[in-house]
């Protein structure tokens, strides 16, 4: 145990002694009630578990979230999480034990106290502040310390997340009878990340152990792939860095998915309820799903999606005017717009409005060499055809700025998701007729995307 971790643990010992003086165990031990939220049970089940984390700062990134409001964060996490992790280390993570009761009152899930725990006092303190589980790190503790600390936790009906980061610690975790083992993909000795650690260590943990992959999980593609090795994930920084926390959680759990061709407020609500991030409004007069600005306003009133206006060889002034009056998040170009058009559009649009470009895929992948284009839509033909192209063309390509479109529905969306694009763009496959979305089909598609 050297470098960063050793320094943190040395400082933690000083902190514990000071806190014991300030808040002696005898002053609150009699008020401690056993936990009634069962951490181990919460992570069981057919679906992959998610421990979502409240984290203001970290040693590797500094401050991650300026407007850190634990109650608000928990109120969003409660819709998605199996358990909620709360950083309580003050010096390195700007955490606090005071965050634990706030989160516990804001969400019904078990609350994990995430700290560098080296003394039974910290576990009593965590339970007093309403934590239902605690982190014990084998990189910090010897076997005797671990046994003592986990016995204290279990005596308070708290769960233990046992963290390992190499083969030796993995073997110790098995010998110590750990029920839930977190594999930290970050090396706390030098703060580097390696997702291969989950792939290497998880298969050797054996049956009966719940495996949680921690650190460095940023995308839906990583989650889908690593879910073959792990029973769940602990995710913090990837979410905390985004202003729109709801969208950030959906991006990782479901992908950056869009429902296009919205014409009714109720369909926008159904798309949002199901799990979409983006809603598409088509301003191409020849489309059966075309809407006016007034209709678009009505659609937008239905749900707080991020709205994308779809245009085809439109006048730049018209695109900018609609983007402004509707507060669009992005404009999507579906015609033969060239680089000069994109340059002029970028100059005229507010900088927070992204530019997306749809590209038609037939028997080869088109180049993605536009400047000032934030995302690409790969579709078959001009869009709205309901036909798919040959997805095998996408193998081995970097696709983190691509949405996949064309004939997507419940029967092929998992296969589409496995291609590795940032997200999927649904339209005709979730409709009962052109422009009329079917809430049951929408729910079915997103349930299918979350069935891992």
Curated annotation (Swiss-Prot):
GO molecular function of the protein, one example? Answer: indole-3-glycerol-phosphate synthase activity
Q: Which organism is it from?
A: Salmonella typhimurium (strain LT2 / SGSC1412 / ATCC 700720)
Q: What is the lineage of its organism?
A: Bacteria, Pseudomonadati, Pseudomonadota, Gammaproteobacteria, Enterobacterales
The protein depicted here goes by the name Tryptophan biosynthesis protein TrpCF
- Which reaction is this enzyme known to catalyze? N-(5-phospho-beta-D-ribosyl)anthranilate = 1-(2-carboxyphenylamino)-1-deoxy-D-ribulose 5-phosphate; 1-(2-carboxyphenylamino)-1-deoxy-D-ribulose 5-phosphate + H(+) = (1S,2R)-1-C-(indol-3-yl)glycerol 3-phosphate + CO2 + H2O
Q: Where is this region: N-(5'-phosphoribosyl)anthranilate isomerase?
A: 257-452
Pathway membership, UniProt: Amino-acid biosynthesis; L-tryptophan biosynthesis; L-tryptophan from chorismate: step 3/5; Amino-acid biosynthesis; L-tryptophan biosynthesis; L-tryptophan from chorismate: step 4/5
Q: Which gene encodes it?
A: trpC
Pfam families reported in the protein's UniProt record:
IGPS, PRAI
Spell out the family assignment given in the record's similarity comment: In the N-terminal section; belongs to the TrpC family. In the C-terminal section; belongs to the TrpF family.
What is the role of this chain?
Answer: Bifunctional enzyme that catalyzes two sequential steps of tryptophan biosynthetic pathway. The first reaction is catalyzed by the isomerase, coded by the TrpF domain; the second reaction is catalyzed by the synthase, coded by the TrpC domain.
Please give the InterPro entries that the UniProt record associates with this protein: Aldolase_TIM, Indole-3-glycerol_P_synth, Indole-3-glycerol_P_synth_dom, Indole-3-GlycerolPSynthase_CS, PRAI_dom, RibuloseP-bd_barrel
């Amino acid at each position: 145990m050297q470098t960063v971790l050793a320094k943190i643990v040395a400082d933690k010992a000083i902190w514990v002694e000071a806190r014991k003086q300030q808040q002696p165990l005898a002053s609150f031990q009699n008020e401690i009630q056993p936990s009634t939220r069962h951490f181990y049970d919460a992570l069981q089940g057919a679906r992959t578990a998610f421990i979502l984390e409240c984290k203001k700062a970290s040693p590797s990134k500094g401050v991650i979230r300026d407007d850190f409001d634990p109650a608000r964060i928990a109120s969003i996490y409660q819709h998605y999480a199996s358990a909620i992790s709360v950083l309580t280390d003050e010096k390195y993570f700007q955490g606090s034990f005071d965050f634990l009761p706030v989160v516990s009152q804001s969400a019904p899930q078990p609350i994990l106290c995430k700290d560098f725990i080296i003394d039974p006092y910290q576990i009593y303190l965590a339970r007093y502040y309403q934590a239902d589980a605690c982190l014990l790190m084998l990189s910090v503790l010897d076997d005797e310390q671990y046994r003592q600390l986990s016995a204290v936790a279990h005596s308070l009906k708290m769960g233990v997340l046992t963290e390992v980061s190499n083969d030796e610690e993995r073997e110790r975790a098995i010998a110590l009878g750990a029920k839930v083992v977190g594999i930290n993909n970050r090396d706390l000795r030098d703060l580097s990340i390696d997702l291969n650690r989950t792939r290497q260590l998880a298969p050797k943990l054996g049956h009966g152990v719940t495996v949680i992959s921690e650190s460095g999980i940023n995308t839906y593609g990583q989650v889908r792939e690593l879910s073959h090795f792990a029973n769940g994930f602990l995710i913090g920084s990837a979410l905390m860095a985004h202003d729109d926390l709801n969208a950030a959680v959906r991006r990782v759990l479901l992908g950056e998915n869009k429902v296009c061709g919205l014409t009714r407020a109720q369909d926008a609500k159904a798309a949002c309820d199901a799990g979409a991030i983006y809603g598409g409004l088509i301003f191409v007069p020849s489309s059966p799903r075309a809407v006016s600005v007034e209709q678009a306003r009505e659609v937008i009133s239905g749900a707080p999606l991020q709205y994308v206006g779809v245009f085809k060889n439109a006048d730049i002034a018209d695109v900018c005017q609609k983007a402004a009056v509707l507060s669009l998040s992005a404009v999507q170009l579906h015609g033969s717009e060239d680089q000069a058009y994109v340059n002029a559009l970028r100059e005229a649009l507010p900088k927070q409005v992204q530019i997306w470009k749809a590209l038609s895929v037939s028997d080869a992948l088109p180049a993605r060499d536009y400047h000032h284009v934030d995302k690409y839509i790969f579709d078959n033909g001009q869009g709205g055809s309901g036909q798919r192209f040959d997805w095998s063309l996408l193998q081995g390509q970097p696709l983190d700025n691509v949405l996949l479109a064309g004939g997507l529905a419940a029967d092929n969306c998992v296969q589409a998701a496995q291609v590795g694009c940032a997200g999927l763009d649904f339209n005709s496959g979730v409709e009962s007729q052109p422009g009329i979305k079917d809430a049951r089909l929408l729910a079915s598609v997103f349930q299918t995307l979350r069935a891992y």
